[in-house]
A protein has these predicted regions:
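General small-molecule cofactor/ligand-binding pocket signal
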Residues: 23-25, 52, 167
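Rossmann-like dinucleotide-binding cores of NAD(P)H-dependent redox enzymes
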Residues: 1-48, 109-115, 123-158
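FAD-site-proximal beta/loop scaffold in flavoenzymes
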Residues: 51-128
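Active-site lining segments that contact anionic ligands and/or coordinate catalytic metals
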Residues: 38, 95, 163
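Short phosphate-binding/catalytic loops that engage adenosine nucleotides
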Residues: 22, 77, 164
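Cytosolic Rossmann-like ligand/nucleotide-binding regulatory domains
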Residues: 160-167
Length: 167
């Protein structure tokens, strides 16, 4: 349920949520929400149609850039993936004088990261000698839930993919 965290953290969080009466359908595609005497959702998971009666629905879709129809293509600004704006370590786009900070650049969608990116962009614009951000692996991350989750550095999976040994 938290795919960017270590698997054991995700397993424990799901266990804690289930103890609170929360049920999950991950990788599900919701087709309909029905507001009747009860709240129900129709969804498909693993090729099967399901119906679930519930009190509330939380749909976690991740981060998607809101870059459609804002004219990026008219300016020739390079994007990648679902519409994230390509930037260098100083938050510069491929067009001189245009910068992109925060979720729109797809680097690490967290408020404190966007703040730091904004500082780098502003100081670069002001002509200051600034250190750019080219490594996001040691930025602290957190998930606001109960129990709380926080991490820094590589996940176990990322470390293994880099050929590092872990304990």
């Amino acid at each position: 349920i938290v795919p960017k965290e270590d698997e054991d953290i995700s397993i424990e969080l799901e266990k804690q949520f289930k103890n609170q009466g929360i049920e999950f359908a991950t990788s599900a595609k919701i087709s309909k929400v029905i507001h009747g005497k009860e709240l129900s959702i129709e969804y498909m998971v693993e090729g099967k149609n399901e119906v679930f009666n519930c009190e509330k629905v939380l749909l976690g879709v991740g981060v998607q850039p809101n870059s459609d129809d804002i004219g990026l293509e008219n300016l020739g600004i390079k994007t990648y993936g679902p519409g994230f704006i390509e930037v260098d370590e100083y938050m510069k786009t491929n067009i001189n004088g245009i910068y992109a900070v925060g979720d729109i650049n797809g680097k690490l969608p967290l408020a404190h990261v966007a703040f730091d990116q904004g500082v780098v962009a502003a100081e670069t614009i002001a002509g200051e000698n600034v250190e750019g951000i080219d490594d996001y692996s040691n930025m602290p991350k957190c998930t606001y839930c109960q129990p709380q989750i926080a991490s820094i550095g590589l996940s176990e999976k990322e470390a293994r993919e880099k050929g590092l040994s872990i304990k």
